[in-house]
Amino acid sequence: MVYLIHFQTKLHHAQHYIGFVASDLMQRIELHRANRGAKLLAALNNNGINWQVVRVWLNGDRTLECRLKNYKKSRCFCPLCTGKA
C-alpha cells in the first residue's frame, strides 16, 4: 500500500512524504517515529515537527508510489492541503 504523510510545518521545501509498504502500515509508521525509516522523517522528528498519515491507497504498489512521487505535487493528493479533510 502507498501512504501520504503531511508535515505540520515545512522542512525546507518539503511538506509531504509518499511511501510504500508491502504489509503492515502501522509497523512502518512506528519505524518512522523511531527514526529507523526515511531520513526525511527522522529529520522531522529531530526538529520537533509533527506529522501524520493523511491518505492511504490500499491497493497501491511501487508503480503508483513512483508515479505519485514523479508528479512532484503531492499537495494535490493531501486532504489537508486541498480542504477535503
PLM regions and their residue ranges:
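GIY-YIG nuclease catalytic motif and its immediate N-terminal context
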Residues: 1-30, 34, 47-85
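Cytochrome P450 catalytic domain signature, combining two hallmark sequence patches
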Residues: 36-42
